Amino acid sequence: MSEIAKWLNTRFQLTLIPKENSNTEFVGPCIFREDGDNTKLFGFRTTLFYTYIGMQTCLLSE
């Protein structure tokens, strides 16, 4: 587990799961909202030196 993943896990109690077919991108848990705008809490890429933390759209299959 990377240092940023450890920090996020400690601070926000998130378990970051590597996306399929990628060892550099991780996603947080889905947040399902009543308005249907389902988003990921965190998404970041190690190749960008952890500078990208943002929202990602959830798929219903997740």
Swiss-Prot record:
Subcellular compartments: Mitochondrion
Source domain of life: Eukaryota
Any one of the GO CC terms: mitochondrion
Alphabetically ordered keywords of this record: Mitochondrion
Entry keyword annotation includes Mitochondrion: yes
Name by which UniProt lists this protein: Uncharacterized mitochondrial protein ymf32
Organism: Marchantia polymorpha (Common liverwort)
Lineage: Eukaryota, Viridiplantae, Streptophyta, Embryophyta, Marchantiophyta
Gene: YMF32
